[in-house]
Swiss-Prot record:
Bias (Gly residues): 25-53
Entry protein name: Dehydrin Rab16B
Domain of life: Eukaryota
One Pfam family, short name: Dehydrin
Gene Ontology BP annotations: cold acclimation; response to abscisic acid; response to water deprivation
Encoding gene (name): RAB16B
Family: Belongs to the plant dehydrin family.
InterPro entries assigned: Dehydrin, Dehydrin_CS
Record organism: Oryza sativa subsp. japonica
Disordered: annotated segments: 1-136, 145-164
Length: 164
């Protein structure tokens, strides 16, 4: 008869601390320990009747008091990028990972070269329009063609005097 009753003579319809019904499979329900007490060996792993035969939950709740704790690291990678047509498109996970890897921005060099070519800046400059030397002031006119794409070295060679 002891197998059909729960702890302290109550019926077998028990609930946990959250109000969820506890079946016989979760805490060991109807089986009794070989010592004869109420301490059943179940999922919790707390066997023995040393604590008055009460079942102890296997996990502990960690409460933070309603405060969200954040780590000190910050990562700001935008989730969208320019699609080349004046609009935006969402980046895939592959692009985000490549963006974070050192030296993995090979796909972005093409965009940067197009922008740098229109401003007349060289590698390492911040796109200054005025350059020292015998420039004509129309540096970006050659790169306006969409049909002809020039490599990075070709752009540098064009800027050197006497190579035309």
């Amino acid at each position: 008869m002891d197998n059909y009753q729960g702890q302290h003579g109550y019926g077998a319809d028990r609930v946990d601390v959250y109000g969820n019904p506890v079946g016989a499979g979760q805490y060991g329900g109807g089986a009794t320990a070989p010592g004869g007490g109420h301490g059943a060996m179940g999922m919790g792993g707390h066997a023995g009747a040393g604590a008055g035969g009460q079942f102890q939950p296997a996990r502990e709740d960690h409460k933070t008091g309603g405060i969200l704790h954040r780590s000190g690291s910050s990562s700001s990678s935008s989730s969208s990028e320019d699609d080349g047509m004046g609009g935006r498109r969402k980046k895939g996970i592959k692009e985000k990972i490549k963006e974070k890897l050192p030296g993995g921005n090979k796909g972005n060099n093409h965009q940067q070269q197009q922008m740098m070519g229109n401003t007349g800046g060289a590698y390492g400059q911040q796109g200054h329009a005025g350059m020292t030397g015998a420039g004509t002031g129309v540096h970006g006119a050659e790169y306006g063609n969409a049909g002809e794409k020039k490599g990075f070295m070709d752009k540098i060679k064009e800027k050197l005097p006497g190579q035309h």
